[in-house]
Amino acid sequence: MEEFQGYLELDKSRQHDLLYPLFFREYIYAFAHDHVLNRSSLLENVSYDNKSGFLIVKHLINRMYHQNNLIISANDSNLKNFGEYNKNLYSQIISEGFVVIMEIPFSLRLVSSLKGTEIVKIYKLRSIHSTFPFLEDKFPHLNYVSNVSIPYPIHPEILVQILRYWVKDASSLHLLRLYLHKYFNWNSIITPKNSVFIFSKMNPRFLLFLYNSHVCEYESILLFLRNKPSHLRLTSSGSFFERIFFYAKIKHSVEEVFVNDFSVTPWFFKAPFMHYVRYRGKSILASKDTPLLMNKWKYYLIHLWQSYFYVWSQPARIYINQLSKHSLIFLGYFSSIRLNLSVVRSQMLKNAFLIDNAMKRLDTLVPISPLIGSLAKMNFCNGLGHPVSKSIWADSSDLDIIDRFAHICRNLSHYYSGSSKKKSLYRIKYILRLSCVKTLSRKHKSTVRAFLKRLGLGLLEEFFTEEEEILSLIFPKTYSTFRKLYRGRIWYLDLFCINDLINHE
């Protein structure tokens, strides 16, 4: 937003609602080009400048409003210089420019909402591991949890309708509608894989913008109800949602849902105590109350998706589990609540008592079987976990091979440093170390035993992780303290992405 704020010259008369003229401004596509298109393989052999990019987009928008948009006239010299008609390239240019423009109202609303308040920049909250300390504090006091897959709209028109609440410019929304219908096969954009939606590699920034707008709308309603549950008792759709296009279409279904399902049990809304966590394409709802509360939220979510987002969701696929009896697969960990039993001796005057003390603790375990399956898919071991050589890396240098294995080993060690039990992590590191040795032995046409005997175990010093080195420097003389800290949980607050090996959910 700061890059092109000087170009916009927006005043207080809500000029930012008119976004359509920005599609024909050259600097918009200069920003988009610098952000993404400069790294695109489609432009490697093409002389691209801001002027030609602007003219190409202008021609493309004009063609989108006519039926014969695939015919290139003799006067389109810029298109001819750019090469023959390339549908993917034009789609890339339009989508990147569209994201730059559509982010303007979101950024302006954020700035206006934070005006007069101090903006606290907490970069550590961006880390994936920042969620786990929250779970350690909250989950031991909760009873029930539901792991829900967030459904995605099956039709692009729903996304256009969602953006109408944020963008008031009808021309821009009309252009978005034309673009989605002409240049995208919606079924190929996202594909369900193990209940997690994965975007195609085409225009990732554009698709992430659409996805985030959809999730933002969904979570704004959900969190509004979570924070103010008394609003669920309202029977009028007009006073429930401030969504213009929502009233006429599904007023009857909204009244039916909230009158029949919610107002019959007013005590249900007095103390919801609901916690919400979202990660990737899933969300977690956890509560301390009875299963009735969880079932009410379950069917509310289903009605919300079907009536508001026109997305079908099966109630049988939303499971409500008791935390003390079921584990939760969350961000590559098996998380569960474990009871730590201890006996405390209490003495009062001459009488002594033995008191059983039970404390709940969040147990985070390394999923050994899925990780071995991921290692087997990448040819580090077989299906049983026996290490094998990585033949595709045998042509690289020795240092390159060691660096590759050590990099994977360090990443896994950092990510699973918060595990309650490290034995599974040690087994994964052992598989990678032995696979590295077998790869080097294969390269030098030698056996593993002869190779290690000739070079020694110092060859694998690269596999020592950073936390081992740092803790050994902090506690050089207290070996027992060093081992105790290393065996404990260490949450790294600088992890912004998940390794492919961990991405097994």
Swiss-Prot record:
Entry protein name = Maturase K
User: At the top level of its lineage, which domain of life is listed?
Assistant: Eukaryota
- Localization: Plastid, Chloroplast
Keyword Heme carried by entry: no
Q: Per its database record, what is this protein's job?
A: Usually encoded in the trnK tRNA gene intron. Probably assists in splicing its own and other chloroplast group II introns.
User: Which terms does the UniProt entry file under GO BP?
Assistant: mRNA processing; RNA splicing; tRNA processing
Gene Ontology molecular function, alphabetical: RNA binding
Q: What is the lineage of its organism?
A: Eukaryota, Viridiplantae, Streptophyta, Embryophyta, Tracheophyta
The residue stretches assigned to a coiled coil in this entry are none
UniProt cross-references to InterPro entries, sorted A to Z: Domain_X, Maturase_MatK, Maturase_MatK_N
Describe the family membership recorded for this protein in Swiss-Prot or TrEMBL: Belongs to the intron maturase 2 family. MatK subfamily.
Keywords from the named record: Chloroplast, mRNA processing, Plastid, RNA-binding, tRNA processing
